[in-house]
Regions:
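N-terminal, polar/charged subdomain of small-to-medium soluble alpha/beta proteins
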Residues: 1-104
Length: 104
């Protein structure tokens, strides 16, 4: 299995919200699955989960293949924000991969 040879280290910070094992596991699983499709070696992703009034915000920053990625999504549900974040990240990574491979 090629996925096991590359690790995605997801570092999660919680702001104005209690850290839960469920949120940690869900975020780590979603981000790792998304990034593993595009990473060629070990990668580190930084995620911030925070609450501002009624807004549930998920932010991600990472460096991959010589490019910095930043994604921020918000909704009224933190799990929905995480889902939107990984969808947006997948789109950014796919566009970057297409741009890089079209130059070769």
């Amino acid at each position: 299995m090629s996925d096991s040879s590359k690790a995605v280290h997801v570092i999660i910070a919680f702001l104005n919200i209690d850290s839960t094992d469920a949120l940690k596991s869900y975020t780590t699983e979603k981000v790792s699955h998304c990034v593993k499709k595009f990473a060629h070696h070990d990668t580190e992703a930084h995620v911030v989960l925070k609450v501002e009034k009624t807004r549930q915000i998920a932010e991600l920053s990472m460096h991959l293949s010589g490019h910095d990625f930043f994604v921020k999504e918000e909704s009224e549900d933190l799990y929905a924000s995480i889902n939107m974040l990984t969808d947006s990240l997948t789109n950014q990574l796919r566009k970057h991969k297409e741009k890089v491979t079209s130059h070769h």
